[in-house]
């Protein structure tokens, strides 16, 4: 029996693939559990259309991420924090703080998960920060942490 997989099935195939399986396996396991549907040309067209929509969505997401990254790389972003005499920060600068501060200055909507920090920043100075945006867009931006007046 020909089936179209609705999910990835180990040792059978990936979502959207058309596979030939035994009738019993399809009727007793794959179809009742929602892993597959019986093959029809209409269903195949619908799945191809769905894949095309998903592909376009990912492409738009990547383009949007590239625009955001281009805007982020234009300048060194300044984050002002309260600090003591030795350049030690009261508290720490986290990814959430960076996203919030950079959003204020650029007007872009940023997510804290896009900023990759090994550990929170605890001293004043300049830092290169890895940014990983949706759509697989990655690069580094410059951050300068300054004392708040």
UniProtKB/Swiss-Prot annotation:
Single GO cellular component term: ribonucleoprotein complex
GO terms for MF: rRNA binding; structural constituent of ribosome
Top-level taxonomic group: Bacteria
Keyword check for Glycosyltransferase: no
Keyword terms: Ribonucleoprotein, Ribosomal protein, RNA-binding, rRNA-binding
Matches recorded under SUPFAM superfamilies: L9 N-domain-like (SSF55658), Ribosomal protein L9 C-domain (SSF55653)
PROSITE patterns on file: RIBOSOMAL_L9
InterPro entries: Ribosomal_bL9, Ribosomal_bL9/RNase_H1_N, Ribosomal_bL9_bac/chp, Ribosomal_bL9_C, Ribosomal_bL9_C_sf, Ribosomal_bL9_N, Ribosomal_bL9_N_sf
Coiled coil: none
GO biological process: translation
Similarity comment text for this entry: Belongs to the bacterial ribosomal protein bL9 family.
Biological function: Binds to the 23S rRNA.
Protein name: Large ribosomal subunit protein bL9
Organism: Thermotoga sp. (strain RQ2)
Protein's gene: rplI
């Amino acid at each position: 029996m020909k089936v179209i997989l609705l999910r990835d099935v180990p040792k059978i195939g990936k979502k959207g693939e058309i596979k030939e399986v035994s009738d019993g396996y399809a009727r007793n396991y794959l179809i009742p559990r929602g892993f597959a549907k019986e093959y029809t040309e209409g269903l195949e067209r619908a799945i191809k259309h769905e894949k095309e929509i998903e592909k376009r969505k990912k492409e738009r997401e990547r383009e949007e991420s590239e625009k955001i990254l281009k805007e982020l790389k234009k300048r060194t972003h300044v984050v002002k924090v309260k600090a003591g005499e030795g350049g030690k920060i009261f508290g720490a600068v986290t990814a959430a703080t960076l996203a919030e501060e950079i959003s204020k200055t650029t007007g872009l909507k940023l997510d804290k998960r896009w900023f990759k920090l090994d550990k929170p920043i605890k001293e004043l100075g300049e830092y290169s920060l890895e940014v990983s945006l949706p759509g697989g867009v990655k690069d580094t931006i410059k951050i300068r942490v300054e004392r708040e007046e």
